[in-house]
Amino acid sequence: VVLLDNGRLKMLKDPQFREALTCLKCGTCLNVCPVFRELSGLIWGYVYVGGIGAIWTSFIHGFEKAAPLAFTCLLCGRCKSVCPMEIDIPVMVLKLRKMLIEAGYIPPPIESIAKNVEVYGNPYGAREKIE
């Protein structure tokens, strides 16, 4: 018998994310996810897709791999409203985002906006005044 932990013990010890262990991976959350509907899961990881996939990815492969997934979630809460285990996925994704930002990760689109404001005085990168 081979037992594969896949980050479960680490997740069990973390009260912020322990709830993710109750995920049945039934896909009910994906059926109502607007991001999944538009992107068909193509960019939502390979551990598992959706917001809960961002949490699992962070524990199995590290926060760096989970970063794009965490910032793709809209935090709309539709997943929570249909989850048979009543997992509060948006709250966990928000906690993951906070941890990523505290570790210095800034999503590329937000970093781009910040640079544009600094260099051009506007978020669009327009060189001339927009009226």
Language-model segments: what does each one mean?
Residues 1-3, 131:
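Short hydrophobic beta-strand segments
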Residues 3-25, 53-75:
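Ferredoxin-like iron-sulfur electron-transfer modules
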Residues 7, 27, 41, 45, ...:
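Residue-identity detector for glycine
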Residues 28-55, 72, 78-99:
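Iron-sulfur cluster-binding cysteine motifs and their immediate structural context
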Residues 60-131:
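Iron-sulfur-cluster electron-transfer modules
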